[in-house]
């Protein structure tokens, strides 16, 4: 039986998605952590869940992060 809460099929792989997200967002705060985590999440599952829709969602979060960084003079 598929455990949709703890281990949904679209997040199964050799590495748990949550572990990847924790590692990738370590040291990031606020919107940078959110955008990074969401982009990775959608890229991680795209083939197993919503296909192109998930790729477009990942792209949206990446673009939003770039806009945030471009508007933040503290990021070099």
Language-model segments: residues:
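Intrinsically disordered, low-complexity regulatory regions
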Residues: 1-76
